[in-house]
Amino acid sequence: MLEKLIILDFGSQTTQLIARRIRELNTYCEVYPYNKLPEDLSGVRGIILSGSPYSVYDSKAFRIELSELRGKLPLLGICYGAQSLVHQAGGKVEPCDSREYGRTHLTLRQPEDALLTGLQSGTTVWMSHGDTITSLPEGFEVIAGTEDVPNAAFRIRGEKTWGVQFHPEIYHSEEGTKLLGNFLDICGMKRDWTPASFIEATVQELRERLGDDKVILALSGGVDSSVVAVLLNKAIGRNLTCIFVDHGLLRKGEFERVLQDYEHLGLNVIGVNAKEKFFAALSGVTDPEQKRKIIGRGFIEVFDEEARKLKDIKWLGQGTIYPDVIESLSITGMVIKSHHNVGGLPERMNLRLVEPLRMLFKDEVRRVGLELGMMPHLIHRHPFPGPGLGIRILGEITEEKATILQNADDIYMSLMREWGLYDQVWQAGAILLPVRSVGVMGDERTYEYTVALRAVTSMDAMSADWVHLPYDFLAKVSNEIINKVRGVNRVVYDISSKPPSTIEWE
């Protein structure tokens, strides 16, 4: 049985960073909403309680009865998680005179404590909280503090339970990863979860689950579906048929390039031209969520049609990854935005889903692909959304707009490669805005569309920063697009980070 660590999410923006740090330590972990702890804890070796935007005293605060967890498994509370442990045990948590935010230095009171093994006294840690622990309950003891936060870290005597008021998952906490590693050692984790072990376990699981069943896989040309294809091919061979749909919203020349790439991989691929179907279904639709769902339904309908042409197809493969799953439903149950690989599926789908990568972050998918021996140019392609340019054309989607955006995007991507910038950027693309503006070309007045350029850096798509592209490069891209793409007379650059913005505009 796969051993794992569970992270209970109380709504912190850094919960996914905790998961990333644990995964980087070759340990498998899963994130669950604070109130959705699985009943079956077989294989679970420990639990981390995340931070939260709330105070423990807020009426809207997310709460669970922590006494039911204490003593059963090793437990680590971070920020709000630590304060909840104290508050529920009768200690005092009070508002800070001023919000404690930023770097500070940690003084070790008990450096021999198992959680602090190998840490240096004075190490930098990152604080971000409006409340602070002012009094510990009986049985709790301080193991580290800072100048302003004397109870920065504590343990509970007789239990494998700890709490820290700082954020070890944040990069600014210099030895945060070491502290998390110490907790994994306390949990008895083997730290042997690697791309190779994932491949071995996943291939075995796929063989057991699928048996002699046949699978069709939704190919997009991106790294996620590419890795799924190779994994499934490794597990079931010729029982896999790949379906690549041209919905008219791919990048320029994408359909032909993708078919050629997969032919080289020895995969059985069927190309389907469904442009007319998608453009007809999207006619007149402007709502972003509706566009996503229409595109999602269209994909499934096409797959169903293709499956009926084949014999005994029972499964639909998809390249869903962990950020897709997490972003599709927030902790409060409010949809942030549905993902093509998660939402938009018809209620009566004729095929069952198989999603081998649904618990991996993007960088982990890439490492698995390299371990599988896939071509680097497939593995290091920028992420591209399942709905394609459909969520980069704001407002109504038409074939004319799709052509405009394909041409603009092609210029942008080509120049990125020419200038040696492509591999320095996590994701980039052009967006066609539903905005026309006045311009002048020659002696004539124009009234045409605006294209926005987007380029971000990221580790796992859970957060992202905009890229400071050279001005000369941006000027070159702007001039090329305006001069060569009919229908565009203005180019702008998006300088928004995630959060609060998302990587895609829709």
Swiss-Prot record:
GO molecular function: ATP binding; GMP synthase activity
EC number: 6.3.5.2
Highest taxon above the source species: Bacteria
Record has Ribonucleoprotein as a keyword: no
Record keywords: ATP-binding, Glutamine amidotransferase, GMP biosynthesis, Ligase, Nucleotide-binding, Purine biosynthesis
UniProt keyword annotation of S-adenosyl-L-methionine present: no
One GO CC term, this protein: cytosol
Binding site for ATP: S220, G221, G222, V223, D224, S225, S226
Chemical reaction(s) catalysed: XMP + L-glutamine + ATP + H2O = GMP + L-glutamate + AMP + diphosphate + 2 H(+)
Pathway: Purine metabolism; GMP biosynthesis; GMP from XMP (L-Gln route): step 1/1
Domain Glutamine amidotransferase type-1: 4-192
Annotated catalytic residues: C79 (nucleophile), H167, E169
Subunit (UniProt): Homodimer.
Biological function: Catalyzes the synthesis of GMP from XMP.
PANTHER family hit by this protein: GMP SYNTHASE [GLUTAMINE-HYDROLYZING] (PTHR11922:SF2), GMP SYNTHASE-RELATED (PTHR11922)
Name of the protein this chain belongs to: GMP synthase [glutamine-hydrolyzing]
Natural source organism: Porphyromonas gingivalis (strain ATCC 33277 / DSM 20709 / CIP 103683 / JCM 12257 / NCTC 11834 / 2561)
Gene: guaA
